[in-house]
Amino acid sequence: MDLKICDTITLRGVVDEDFVNYKKASMFLGTAFCDWKCCREIGIAPSACQNHQTVTSSKARAIPIESLCRRYLQNSITSAVVFGGLEPFLQTEEVLSFVRTLRGMGCEDDVVIYTGYEPNEVSKPLELLRNYPNIVVKFGRYRPNSDGVFDPTLGVHLASSNQHAERIS
């Protein structure tokens, strides 16, 4: 998988201090794109997705990765970065460029990636991410009307019982 190094990352939102998506105070980066795979597989409209409003209510914008990393590092409250909101692995080059830049600045805080994919569907990006320390990935599609589950790796309650997180490095 040949990846280019990106200077910007396209996001639909940035929350400087998030206390919901991980057991540590985090910067939450709302990724910009989704292929609605979860919805297509079970035959429901994308509007039924818990994240659909993110697409319809917020505009995607390119943000310089280096300045975003500096912004994170200047916040003494946060100790992790969480990618989520839509599908981060549709922006693999940008996510990897962010991780590479953050690690290059000497920061080894946890980076958490919420994906609707299963490990076998994103094996190449996972292989590349394993080169960096402290990467956590939440796997599994959103299933409406599913019982949620507490995930001990993330330290939070997930929306669907088929979802789980793994520390991959």
Region annotations inferred by a language model:
Residues T54-C69, F89-N131:
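Canonical radical SAM enzyme core domain
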